[in-house]
């Protein structure tokens, strides 16, 4: 990790900014001083599960310990980013708010911004209007911003996907005054994962109506890199990056795509993600499915587009139907369809 950190520092980039993460103790803080970073994350677990059962401290002892390391960081001119671990199981008014208020006093005294990362460690957070604290994402962000007076730009949301709410919770945190949400490439992370970066890039565009300079074709490049270089297996149906996220199998849907892509494609995936809409050919594809596959796979445009009435379409459709009549039950692969097309063409 130290070698990776120094290699990144040697590149000399301003962004993305390199930060570290430590436990709230002197031994870990010594490593931060040696690293030469301008900001460090500090683990400040907030729930009684962590304070009593993991660290065997009282709430006062925990807060004093946390504040001691924060003060040490400020004395060195290092910006603290306090990770309020397990906030969705913490006593919000009994511990979270008083602690956040103390941090804001220190921030005002030192002149350095202290960030607060609200960590939904176990994914218990909910975005529903009227939900009670500590599980309420709106309540957590509103409370930190308005009661503890934490500036929006110093608030972060950190979610987990244990209950399938990681994206909706992150979007809700934005809407209630949290300027930043933590993401990971493809949503990789502990247990069920963290919030996917690609999801929040699309969510941002949906909420703001603009990409603000983002090139989302990079999402596709990132997915390809993660598969090729790191060996990450992406679920075929994972939104925006999965192999089949914009692939339709139903013949009636394929017919709609032929008439107007907007009918059955979520947006212009070719333009925005460099991923043209595709049709998988199987027993239900019919003439429309085969026609769309031919035009999309061979990237035919304008006068080159093959109509549904073309003899090549009907011949290929009949060959596919014959395979399924003989007992095939898997989707046709692009490569085998291409071989069939070239065989028909030579005949």
Feature annotation, model-predicted:
Residues 1-26, 278-281, 285, 296:
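N-terminal capping/small domains of soluble enzymes
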Residues 17-20, 82-83, 154-158:
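Short catalytic-loop micro-motif centered on adjacent basic/acidic residues
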Residues 10-13, 71-78, 101-109, 142-150, ...:
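Generic secondary-structure signature for well-ordered alpha-helical cores
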Residues 17, 41, 180-183:
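Short hydrophobic alpha-helical runs that function as membrane-insertion/retention elements
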Residues 122-265:
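Catalytic alpha/beta core domains of metabolic enzymes, predominantly
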Residues 5-11, 26-153, 171-176:
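Alpha/beta enzyme core
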Residues 210-347:
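A mid-to-C-terminal "edge-of-domain" accessory segment
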Residues 18, 22, 59, 89, ...:
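Hydrophobic alpha-helical scaffolding
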């Amino acid at each position: 990790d130290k070698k990776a950190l120094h290699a990144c520092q040697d590149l000399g980039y301003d962004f993305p900014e390199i930060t570290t993460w430590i436990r709230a103790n002197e031994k870990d803080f010594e490593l931060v001083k040696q690293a030469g970073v301008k900001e460090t994350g500090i683990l400040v677990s907030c729930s009684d599960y962590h304070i009593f059962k993991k660290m065997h401290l009282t709430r006062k002892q925990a807060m004093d310990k946390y504040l001691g390391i924060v003060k040490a960081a400020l004395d060195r001119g290092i910006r603290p980013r306090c990770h309020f671990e397990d906030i969705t199981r913490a006593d919000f008014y009994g511990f979270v708010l008083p602690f956040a208020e103390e941090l804001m006093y220190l921030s005002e005294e030192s002149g350095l911004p202290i960030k607060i990362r609200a960590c939904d460690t176990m994914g218990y957070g909910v975005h529903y209007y009227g939900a009670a604290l500590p599980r309420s994402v709106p309540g957590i962000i509103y409370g930190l911003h308005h009661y503890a007076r934490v500036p929006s730009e110093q608030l972060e949301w950190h979610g987990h996907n244990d209950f399938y709410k990681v994206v909706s919770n992150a979007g809700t945190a934005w809407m209630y005054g949290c300027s930043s949400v933590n993401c990971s490439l493809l949503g990789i992370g502990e247990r069920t994962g963290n919030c996917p970066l690609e999801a929040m890039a699309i969510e941002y565009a949906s909420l703001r109506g603009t990409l603000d300079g983002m090139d989302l074709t990079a999402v596709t490049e990132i997915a390809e890199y993660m598969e090729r270089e790191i060996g990450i297996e992406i679920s075929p149906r994972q939104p925006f990056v999965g192999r089949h996220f914009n692939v339709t199998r139903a013949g009636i849907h394929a017919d709609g795509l032929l008439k107007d892509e907007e009918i059955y494609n979520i947006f212009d995936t070719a333009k925005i993600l460099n991923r043209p809409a595709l049709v998988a050919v199987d027993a239900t594809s019919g003439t429309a499915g085969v026609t769309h596959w031919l035009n999309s796979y061979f990237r035919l445009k304008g006068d080159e587009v093959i109509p549904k009435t073309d003899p090549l379409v009907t011949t290929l459709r009949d060959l596919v139907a014959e395979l399924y009549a003989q007992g095939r039950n898997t989707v046709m692969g692009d490569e085998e369809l291409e071989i069939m097309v070239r065989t028909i063409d030579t005949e």
